[in-house]
């Protein structure tokens, strides 16, 4: 139809079965060939947890939903600013990582096609994980984007876990609520990119900048305010532009 959106956009949704008056913003993850929107909804607050619980209870009974969802948007945040940056340093923390997922998915689809027509030459992603709500669905995308060319690199920081909490290799687990199936697969190379503490931004950004000295770098941040101050300080010290949320 007339619904136009770009990667990184979000919509507000209202579900009368949950609340008549409340509207909540959710990131657009992708759109199917039939025109259905796939949104990233995390059950980490009262409204979205209610939505999650009610959806599961309905599916368990008769495997169908007949709810009317009202939608307002889209609003952006598009991927344009990232695609127009030669060296994009993405920093996602907590729920903020979901902002980058559709953008990275879009870039992933363009890899090998017409990405050469954009200024973007290199992506460094820094992912700060405070809980594992977003780990399952994001790891496969990282695995798919990692290639030999060095175009895309990622660094993962578990700040709620110790190395002892993991086996030697990290597992990807996907759950299909409708079929009640669980698929588990091993992802080898995530382990090499993982740390168990907050990064030293002076060190990480200096390394990143030195490796890409011929490219103009920008940092894009999405996540809680508590992680922003040290990042902002390092960006200022190293003279790297910092863009938060509005991109």
Go through the PLM ranges and name each one.
Residues 39, 44-48, 53-58, 64, ...:
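Reductase modules of NAD(P)H-dependent flavoproteins
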Residues 28, 97-116, 140-142:
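Histidine-anchored nucleotide/phosphate-binding helix
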Residues 83-88, 118-122, 215-216:
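A short, charged/proline- and glycine-enriched loop
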Residues 2-90, 105, 175, 246:
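FAD-binding FR-type
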Residues 79-82, 114-115, 209-211:
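Short boundary motifs at domain starts and secondary-structure transition points
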Residues 17, 34, 57, 106-113, ...:
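Short amphipathic alpha-helical interaction elements and helix-loop-helix interfaces
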């Amino acid at each position: 139809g007339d619904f136009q959106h770009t990667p990184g956009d979000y919509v507000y949704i209202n579900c009368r079965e949950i609340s008549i008056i409340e509207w909540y913003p959710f990131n657009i993850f992708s759109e199917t060939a039939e025109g259905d929107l796939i949104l990233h909804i995390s059950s980490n607050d009262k409204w979205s947890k209610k939505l999650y619980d009610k959806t599961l209870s309905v599916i368990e009974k008769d495997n169908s939903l007949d709810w009317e969802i009202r939608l307002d948007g889209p609003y952006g945040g598009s991927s344009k600013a990232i695609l127009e940056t030669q060296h994009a340093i993405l920093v996602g923390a907590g729920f903020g990582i979901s902002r980058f997922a559709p953008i990275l998915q879009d870039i992933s689809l363009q890899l090998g096609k017409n990405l050469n027509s954009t200024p973007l030459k290199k992506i460094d992603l820094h992912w700060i994980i405070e809980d594992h709500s977003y780990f399952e669905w994001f790891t496969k995308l990282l695995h798919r984007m990692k290639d030999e060319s060095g175009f895309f690199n990622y660094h993962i920081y578990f700040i709620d876990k110790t190395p002892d909490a993991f086996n030697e290799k990290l597992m990807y687990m996907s759950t299909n609520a409708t079929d009640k199936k669980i698929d588990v697969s091993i992802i080898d190379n995530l382990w090499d990119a993982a740390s168990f503490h907050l990064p030293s931004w002076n060190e990480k950004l200096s390394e990143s900048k030195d490796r890409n000295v011929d490219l103009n770098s920008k940092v894009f941040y999405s996540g809680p305010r508590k992680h922003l101050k040290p990042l902002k300080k390092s960006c200022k010290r190293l003279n790297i532009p910092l863009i938060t949320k509005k991109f």
